[in-house]
């Protein structure tokens, strides 16, 4: 199953400035020749790969990018100032196509790699360029050329930063729906989630991470029971594991340990990943709920219904995600089954 983030934006490079119609006006020079300067170039638009970016989420909030036009030429042969260039930063590995022709424009894979995608219009020539022996006082200049404009279609194979692990009905789908814009199927019965759902969690502007709601695990998953190996293959690709146990579980500590044991049976290396334990559904927790003591693992208690603890969880997830190197990510591009 391929997980692809996509966005479409409009870009408009700046138009070139007009050339100037002007004549020298100096003392003792009653009939000065043409001295109109050229217009400035319109601003270019560049794409730049940035390894700190993980998703295309910010392009859902800003859809248009307009570079400024070049300034018009002036007298005394002064050329107008060039328009300001725009640099649009995108995650490494983003495929960029012309939305109309679907032609591949860019595939920037290295951090800092840049590409010019829309050229600003050339500035028009001033009237100084049009003087001839028979026409010594030309009264016209060129307009600036239009900047390039089109729509860009961007696609990015997502890297899962955070994997949600838990038995069916632990509240994984509900959590991902309140932290992100994902709309997974949610119902009060086991195995509602049959394929991984991905949600993009926006932490701050230009800061986001990807959360994978993995299908519910059951005891024996490492041997292939339930969704078994289909589930565990996707867990391998995440950087941080969040182990969820519902507050109404019969024995929270035992359920947590069972989940950890299933991970260890499949691949003991999974236990080397950063891990957070989360007790969900605190809105229905009983007064005599026993909070387990988990050595070496941060434990948070949340309610996706009331919002209790969600900010603390989001802060902790971002803290851990931002310390992990994105260079070790693997695209989520395998098929289930």
UniProtKB/Swiss-Prot annotation:
Domain annotation OBG-type G: ranges: 160-322
Keyword GTP-binding: yes
Amino-acid positions noted as binding GTP in the UniProt annotation, renumbered to this chain: 166-173, 191-195, 213-216, 280-283, 303-305
NCBIfam families named in the record: Obg_CgtA (TIGR02729), PRK12297.1 (NF008955), PRK12299.1 (NF008956)
CDD domains for the chain: Obg
GO CC terms: cytoplasm
Subunit structure: Monomer.
InterPro entries, per the entry: G_OBG, GTP-bd, GTP-bd_Obg/CgtA, GTP1-OBG_CS, GTP1_OBG_dom, GTP1_OBG_dom_sf, OBG_GTPase, P-loop_NTPase
Main localization, broad class: cytoplasm
Root EC class: hydrolase
Subcellular location: Cytoplasm
Sequence ranges assigned to domain Obg in this UniProt record: 1-159
CC cofactor: Mg(2+)
EC number: 3.6.5.-
Species in which this protein is naturally found: Chlorobium phaeobacteroides (strain DSM 266 / SMG 266 / 2430)
Role noted for this protein: An essential GTPase which binds GTP, GDP and possibly (p)ppGpp with moderate affinity, with high nucleotide exchange rates and a fairly low GTP hydrolysis rate. Plays a role in control of the cell cycle, stress response, ribosome biogenesis and in those bacteria that undergo differentiation, in morphogenesis control.
Keywords, sorted A to Z: Cytoplasm, GTP-binding, Hydrolase, Magnesium, Metal-binding, Nucleotide-binding
Name under which the protein is recorded: GTPase Obg
Family: Belongs to the TRAFAC class OBG-HflX-like GTPase superfamily. OBG GTPase family.
Gene Ontology molecular function terms on file: GTP binding; GTPase activity; magnesium ion binding
One Pfam family in the UniProt entry: GTP1_OBG
Residues holding Mg(2+): 173, 193
Gene: obg
Keyword Magnesium tagged: yes
Biological process per Gene Ontology, one example term: ribosome biogenesis
Domain of life: Bacteria
């Amino acid at each position: 199953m391929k997980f692809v983030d996509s966005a479409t934006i409009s870009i408009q490079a700046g138009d070139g400035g007009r050339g100037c119609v002007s004549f020298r006006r100096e003392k003792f020079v009653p009939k000065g020749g043409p001295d109109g300067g050229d217009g400035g170039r319109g601003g270019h638009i560049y794409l730049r790969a940035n390894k700190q970016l993980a998703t295309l989420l910010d392009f859902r909030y800003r859809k248009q990018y307009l570079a400024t036009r070049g300034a018009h030429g002036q007298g005394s042969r002064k050329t107008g100032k060039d328009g300001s260039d725009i640099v649009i930063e995108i995650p490494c590995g983003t495929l960029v196509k012309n939305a109309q022709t679907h032609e591949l424009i860019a595939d920037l894979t290295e951090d800092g790699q840049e590409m010019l995608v829309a050229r600003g219009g050339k500035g028009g020539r001033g009237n100084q360029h049009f003087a001839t022996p028979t026409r010594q006082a030309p009264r016209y200049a060129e307009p600036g050329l239009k900047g390039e404009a089109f729509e860009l279609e961007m696609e990015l194979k997502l890297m899962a930063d955070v994997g949600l692990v838990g038995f069916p009905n632990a509240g994984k789908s509900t959590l991902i729906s309140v932290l992100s814009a994902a709309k997974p199927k949610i119902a009060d019965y086991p195995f509602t989630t049959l394929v991984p759902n991905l949600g993009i969690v926006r932490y701050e502007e230009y800061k986001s991470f990807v959360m994978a709601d993995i299908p519910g695990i059951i005891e024996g998953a490492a041997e292939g029971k339930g969704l078994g190996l289909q589930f565990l293959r996707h867990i391998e690709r995440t950087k941080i594991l969040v182990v969820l146990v519902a507050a109404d579980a019969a024995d929270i500590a035992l359920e947590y340990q069972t989940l950890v044991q299933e991970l260890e049976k499949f691949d003991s290396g999974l236990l080397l990943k950063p891990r957070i334990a989360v007790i969900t559904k605190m809105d229905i927790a009983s007064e005599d709920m026993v909070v387990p003591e988990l050595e070496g693992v941060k434990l948070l208690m949340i309610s996706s219904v009331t919002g209790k603890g969600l900010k603390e969880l989001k802060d902790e997830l971002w803290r851990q995600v931002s310390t992990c190197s994105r260079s070790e990510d693997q695209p989520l591009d395998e098929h289930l089954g």
